Amino acid sequence: MSTNLEVGIVGLPNVGKSTLFNAITKAGAEAANYPFCTIEPNVGVVDVPDKRLDVLSDMFKSKKIVPAAMRFVDIAGLVKGESKGEGLGNKFLSHIREVDAVAEVVRCFEDGNITHVEGSIDPLRDIDIINTELCLADMETVEKRQERLVKLAKTGDKKVKLEQAVMEKVMAGLSDGVPARRLGLTEEEQEFLGELHLLTMKPVLYITNVAEGEVADPSGNEHVQAVKKYAAEENAEVIVVSAKMESEVAELPEEEAKEYLEMAGLEETGLDRLIKAGFKLLGLMTFLTAGEMESRAWTIKLNTKAPQAAGKIHTDFERGFIRAEIVSFDDLVACGSKAAAREKGLVRLEGKDYVMQDGDVVEFRFNV
């Protein structure tokens, strides 16, 4: 995974996807009321909000702050028959293969002025259409691999036999419209799929787009409740946003935006909730480095060991890793300075087997 986490935003036409994306990146992608106005994916890079960086920057008198980043890719509106080239075809599907996770925007608001491509509001049907298209595209990928395996099987390699069995299992699921991630595959089975970059193996989060008044309390919105129930079956994340409201907030100065959110009964923007959900979905966390030059956040997978975390900064750090000098952010703040934390014995030296924790403030020692 690159340093920047990449999330592809997909949805049927006119569900509020581009409006939401514009709000996310203030990128001004053409949010228009007709299908296919975004064929080339628009990419927006946003900072991952982290108040700890401000605290570290003050403490270490850092010249700059470098937050972690998340890339959002607005992938063109999808329609039925996509994988057969009826809508935007394979161009759309190749864009989505490159992302770490997929965020599906589904419409859960009524508005007579905005047409729905399927004629009525039904988010579960919309999810089903998207899943069907992604399953069909994956079937083509698996089929090509199966053809290749037939040739390889002639060598009598046992591993090929195992892989063939996995492909059959996945193909059967996809044929029934079951995404590969819902097939309960073992880790060993998943390894065979690694290089195929199957679309339906990617973790998914659902963004339910509601009317402005329902964001703080969507309990009365039956569409949202239906999506939540569906998502629970695959441990997927669901976030509730109003794309219209997000685009309004995005235009405001920070203080006014805060007041606007408070009036709506919200503590944070939909974007912040989306980023948190993305982190949770992909099992990510943050460690921090701080000094006079900069205070910076680094994104790693949960359970990453110290040398691999060091490698995020520079490959030399991993190669020549000696030790990591670590203090937890909370301990550091409680003590007021690194020197005070050291006096209290809260600054630790950790070796190559240390598993990083969220909020570790680190200085790596290495020798190349």
Which sequence ranges carry the predicted segments?
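Conserved G1/Walker A P-loop phosphate-binding module
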Residues: 1-115, 143-144
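C-terminal-of-GTPase-core extension/linker across diverse P-loop GTPases
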Residues: 1-10, 15, 21, 148-355, ...
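Glycine-rich, flexible loop/turn motifs
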Residues: 27-35, 42-44, 52-55, 84, ...
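Amphipathic alpha-helical transducer elements in NTP-driven molecular machines
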Residues: 36, 50-53, 66-72, 86-100, ...
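Short capping/connector residues at structural and topological boundaries
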Residues: 36, 41-44, 51-53, 58-65, ...
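Conserved Switch II/interswitch segment of TRAFAC-class P-loop GTPases
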Residues: 44-49, 76-86, 97-159, 173-186, ...
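Short, flexible surface segments
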Residues: 98, 357-358
